[in-house]
């Protein structure tokens, strides 16, 4: 069944009420999802994206009921991931010569998934256009690392519809298609959850890319996403939220999460929260036991928070596995402008809290003092936990923006070479992040004073996660 989006544009996608796991099991889609595909019928007929591979046969059957497949003139693939382009093999078996418009990186991804290099690929770049008749064009905009290297958006003139790919979407299933028709609380919760868990690592790319798109001075009457609703009522509201979320976002909120073996660390978490509330009753404090909580809800709360307290019991001298896994995930999400403190209980030997503190610092958090308790905390120990909460509340609520912690030596004191000795600065050609040899990249164990030639080959750009081969000498230093 198709749904009219606007004029000659129809939704021909697939709802998935049952899906509960995405990206393996990394993202819990508790409200299902949809795979949005769009059919445009002008003088030329255009299909934008397909659906998840598990619905390939249904998709092609439904599409055939809408249009003779041989009448499809162009296929646009904004993103090569299987939930977008998964039905290509089934579709191209019917219309093998139909041109597929996508980015150069998408060809590599599509061939990697479908293994059909003979398909009729047409590479497009930012600013390229495709005439579809009736005075209308498609304009392509590359959006690398939002959230794959192959990503792009497609804008349709005349109808002023932006087919935005994953950006501005959400894993949210509803029989109604448009943003003004669905439950608004559910919608915006899922929008923020989607951004926090998927797009946060690329926040530094969001603002310049949105600015670039706005720079085309094109009207936007609708934003047609790849998942969830189509934004037809005040579509720029979600754009404004993205600009807000991309700027080191935080609320007056503290998240506490922990894992525990014998409830001892849970007791500490509760007492710390009590201490925070005593000093600052206005701050929102959320507590999660990771063994019983939705991981993505925890990460969304971390995204919203100004600080996080992480607790773990000690097991075999290390932290609990679920805590270790979640901290590793936070490292990949690259949260910014947030503080952290570790706490936990132990028996005959400790070790977990110290390791946890180190991992949180490696993940980019500004660290406050940690807290340890031996065995089950008694009344005196619980009072120490409450005092720790009071101290945290004062530090995080009243202090200015986080400063460099004492554990990290100031960069100025660690630099022993002059800039001239270290060679040129290098700039990522994709996201424009600059590697300064004088500063190094501590999160990847590249010490200050490391020339680019000595940076390990497995180095990844901290902003877009691409390798050394995309770096060029900074233009201002090139000879």
UniProtKB/Swiss-Prot annotation:
Sequence ranges assigned to domain Flavodoxin-like in this UniProt record: 254-393
Keyword check for tRNA-binding: no
Every Rubredoxin-like domain range: 423-474
Binding positions (FMN): 260-264, 342-369
Protein's cellular compartments: Cytoplasm
Keywords: Cytoplasm, Electron transport, Flavoprotein, FMN, Iron, Metal-binding, Oxidoreductase, Transport
Family annotation (InterPro entries): Anaer_NO_rdtase_flvorubredoxin (IPR023957), Flavodoxin/NO_synth (IPR008254), Flavoprotein-like_sf (IPR029039), Metallo-B-lactamas (IPR001279), ODP_dom (IPR045761), RibonucZ/Hydroxyglut_hydro (IPR036866), Rubredoxin-like_dom (IPR024934), Rubredoxin-O_OxRdtase (IPR016440)
Any GO MF annotation of the entry: iron ion binding
Pathway: Nitrogen metabolism; nitric oxide reduction
Positions with a binding annotation for Fe cation 1: 79, 81, 147, 166
Cellular component, GO, one term: cytoplasm
Annotated residues for binding of Fe cation 3: 428, 431, 461, 464
Domain of life per record: Bacteria
Similarity section: In the N-terminal section; belongs to the zinc metallo-hydrolase group 3 family.
Subunit and interaction comment: Homotetramer.
Role played: Anaerobic nitric oxide reductase; uses NADH to detoxify nitric oxide (NO), protecting several 4Fe-4S NO-sensitive enzymes. Has at least 2 reductase partners, only one of which (NorW, flavorubredoxin reductase) has been identified. NO probably binds to the di-iron center; electrons enter from the NorW at rubredoxin and are transferred sequentially to the FMN center and the di-iron center. Also able to function as an aerobic oxygen reductase.
PANTHER family xrefs: ANAEROBIC NITRIC OXIDE REDUCTASE FLAVORUBREDOXIN
Protein name: Anaerobic nitric oxide reductase flavorubredoxin
Protein's organism: Salmonella typhimurium (strain LT2 / SGSC1412 / ATCC 700720)
Lineage: Bacteria, Pseudomonadati, Pseudomonadota, Gammaproteobacteria, Enterobacterales
Gene that encodes it: norV
